[in-house]
């Protein structure tokens, strides 16, 4: 496991600390720099000399240097009994950005430094950022305007004083807004969700170049899946869903630092023989059959995938580690899904089913990475998605434990026609607050309660 040292001075000069998602995949390392006006060690982000797709703008800035994330001395910290906004900010570590000359770093370049720190320090829910250089106040306003950061909170008693204000060049950078795409310089979609076109549009015309899918409702009648009454149907009233990404396109990617590999999700193409072959072979594995019971011929599996492709409420996905496919996901809008007939689903709530097909990529470290990344995608794909839901079998303890680890709560048990299920739900607030994207201890939803189930 590729663990990044806590302190920047311990990093090897060629160690990758950050790798941009698809399609760029540019790698960055941290190098020691110098700054005459400070005695603190300072560093610079430098791109590694590997062939990648050229960036559309300059992210690297030789003149922008930064300190490590430094905590205040214990004597300077507020007491533990003070949990106000100012006190919480003071407990957060501080990073200082320096630059010389009249050229001011761009918001894009500041975003890259923030990305590096939240990748190297995933446990930080915020950090203080001090800007030191020409026109620092203007860069600070830009960071606040895109909600990558906020003003450093003022001490409660000072708020009552008319002249009270914080240093305008000191900000509080927020992990929760960063991972939702705040300040991302690659267009209207967060960098982890490439701007791919649906198959009907030209490759140069991405769906995100249009306004967010308008809200308009329709009704759907579908089979209820009752094994005793195959003709029983259920009706749902739900928003019309946006167009699906083009089959074969990458819909999400993120470099996993503790594995040193790129996780990605590809929209499955039912006309791609390799995609169908993988699905068929994986579904023929007795281990997979225990949960999915989809014993079918190759042609039947092809028709199964074609039917899902035509269903506007479901999206089929192949997941990869680097270039190796390893898992299959079915993503759905909950309102018109079978589950929607048993819960009060929100208009944009989503759910997922999944299995790992390639046994080489099993194990808790990898599961934690793709489980959280899949959730991350569902929240990023449509900012109106407020909850992710699930309905694993109530006896499936491993799935339940992974859900608990990644921020889900057990709402109640529901009796579907084919099984008794645990209705699991995770809110957007919970996900981005507890932040399960790191390789953390196996505890329940960001608490200190350890998982006892063997994973």
UniProtKB/Swiss-Prot annotation:
InterPro entries, per the entry: Acyl_CoA_acyltransferase, Acyltransferase_MbtK/IucB-like
Keyword Transferase attributed: yes
Enzyme class: transferase
Pathway membership, UniProt: Mycotoxin biosynthesis
Assigned EC number: 2.3.1.-
Functional note: Putative O-acetyltransferase; part of the satratoxin SC2 cluster involved in the biosynthesis of satratoxins, trichothecene mycotoxins that are associated with human food poisonings. Satratoxins are suggested to be made by products of multiple gene clusters (SC1, SC2 and SC3) that encode 21 proteins in all, including polyketide synthases, acetyltransferases, and other enzymes expected to modify the trichothecene skeleton. SC1 encodes 10 proteins, SAT1 to SAT10.
Protein name: Putative O-acetyltransferase SAT14
Organism: Stachybotrys chartarum (strain CBS 109288 / IBT 7711) (Toxic black mold)
């Amino acid at each position: 496991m590729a663990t990044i040292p806590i302190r920047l001075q311990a990093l090897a000069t060629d160690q990758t600390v950050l790798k941009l998602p698809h399609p760029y995949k540019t790698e960055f390392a941290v190098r020691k720099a110098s700054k005459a006006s400070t005695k603190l060690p300072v560093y610079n982000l430098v791109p590694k000399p590997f062939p990648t797709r050229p960036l559309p703008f300059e992210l690297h800035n030789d003149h922008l240097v930064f300190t490590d994330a430094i905590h205040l001395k214990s004597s300077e910290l507020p007491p533990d009994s003070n949990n106000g906004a100012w006190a919480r900010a003071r407990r957060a570590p501080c990073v200082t950005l320096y630059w010389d000359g009249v050229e001011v770093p761009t918001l894009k370049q500041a975003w890259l430094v923030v990305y590096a720190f939240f990748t190297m320090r995933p446990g930080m829910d915020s950090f203080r950022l001090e800007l030191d250089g020409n026109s620092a106040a203007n860069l600070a306003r830009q960071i606040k305007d895109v909600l990558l950061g906020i003003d450093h909170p003022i001490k409660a008693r000072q708020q009552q004083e008319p002249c009270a204000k914080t240093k305008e060049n000191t900000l509080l950078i927020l992990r929760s807004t960063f991972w939702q795409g705040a300040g991302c310089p690659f267009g209207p979609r967060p960098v982890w969700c490439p701007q791919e076109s649906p198959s009907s549009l030209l490759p140069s015309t991405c769906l995100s170049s249009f306004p967010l899918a308008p809200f308009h409702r329709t009704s759907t009648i579908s089979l209820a899946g009752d094994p005793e009454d195959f003709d029983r149907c259920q009706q749902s009233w739900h928003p019309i869903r946006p167009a699906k990404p083009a089959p074969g396109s990458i819909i999400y990617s993120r470099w996993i630092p503790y594995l040193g590999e790129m996780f990605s999700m590809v929209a499955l193409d039912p006309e791609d023989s390799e995609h169908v072959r993988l699905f068929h072979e994986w579904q023929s594995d007795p281990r997979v059959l225990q949960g999915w019971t989809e014993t079918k011929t190759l042609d039947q599996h092809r028709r199964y995938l074609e039917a899902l492709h035509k269903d506007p409420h479901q999206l089929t996905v192949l997941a990869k580690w680097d270039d190796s496919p390893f898992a299959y996901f079915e993503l759905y809008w909950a309102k018109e899904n079978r589950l929607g007939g048993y819960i009060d689903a929100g208009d944009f709530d989503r759910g997922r089913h999944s299995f790992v097909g390639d046994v080489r990529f099993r194990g808790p470290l990898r599961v934690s990475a793709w489980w959280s990344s899949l959730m991350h995608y569902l929240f990023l794909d449509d900012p109106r998605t407020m909850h992710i839901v699930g309905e694993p079998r109530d006896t499936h303890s491993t799935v339940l434990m992974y859900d608990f680890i990644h921020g889900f709560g057990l709402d109640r048990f529901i009796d579907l026609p084919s099984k008794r299920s645990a209705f699991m739900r995770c809110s957007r607030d919970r996900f981005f607050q507890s932040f399960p994207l790191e390789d953390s201890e196996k505890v329940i939803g960001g608490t200190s309660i350890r998982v006892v189930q063997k994973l």
